[in-house]
Amino acid sequence: MEVNILAFIATALFILVPTAFLLIIYVKTVSQSD
């Protein structure tokens, strides 16, 4: 079974980008609260 590298990269970005964005917002919020 051949893995489609572009599909894998697209899926990884689709998951990682929003996760990183939310993580940055969370860190900023915690920093401001402290």
UniProtKB/Swiss-Prot annotation:
<comment type="function">
    <text>One of the components of the core complex of photosystem II (PSII). PSII is a light-driven water:plastoquinone oxidoreductase that uses light energy to abstract electrons from H(2)O, generating O(2) and a proton gradient subsequently used for ATP formation. It consists of a core antenna complex that captures photons, and an electron transfer chain that converts photonic excitation into a charge separation. This subunit is found at the monomer-monomer interface.</text>
</comment>
<keyword id="KW-0934">Plastid</keyword>
<dbReference type="InterPro" id="IPR007826">
    <property type="entry name" value="PSII_PsbM"/>
</dbReference>
<keyword id="KW-0150">Chloroplast</keyword>
<keyword id="KW-0793">Thylakoid</keyword>
<dbReference type="GO" id="GO:0009523">
    <property type="term" value="C:photosystem II"/>
</dbReference>
<dbReference type="GO" id="GO:0009535">
    <property type="term" value="C:chloroplast thylakoid membrane"/>
</dbReference>
<comment type="subunit">
    <text>PSII is composed of 1 copy each of membrane proteins PsbA, PsbB, PsbC, PsbD, PsbE, PsbF, PsbH, PsbI, PsbJ, PsbK, PsbL, PsbM, PsbT, PsbX, PsbY, PsbZ, Psb30/Ycf12, at least 3 peripheral proteins of the oxygen-evolving complex and a large number of cofactors. It forms dimeric complexes.</text>
</comment>
<keyword id="KW-1133">Transmembrane helix</keyword>
<dbReference type="GO" id="GO:0019684">
    <property type="term" value="P:photosynthesis, light reaction"/>
</dbReference>
<keyword id="KW-0604">Photosystem II</keyword>
<keyword id="KW-0812">Transmembrane</keyword>
<keyword id="KW-0602">Photosynthesis</keyword>
<protein>
    <recommendedName>
        <fullName>Photosystem II reaction center protein M</fullName>
    </recommendedName>
</protein>
<keyword id="KW-0674">Reaction center</keyword>
<comment type="similarity">
    <text>Belongs to the PsbM family.</text>
</comment>
<dbReference type="Pfam" id="PF05151">
    <property type="entry name" value="PsbM"/>
</dbReference>
<dbReference type="InterPro" id="IPR037269">
    <property type="entry name" value="PSII_PsbM_sf"/>
</dbReference>
<feature type="transmembrane region" description="Helical">
    <location>
        <begin position="5"/>
        <end position="25"/>
    </location>
</feature>
<keyword id="KW-0472">Membrane</keyword>
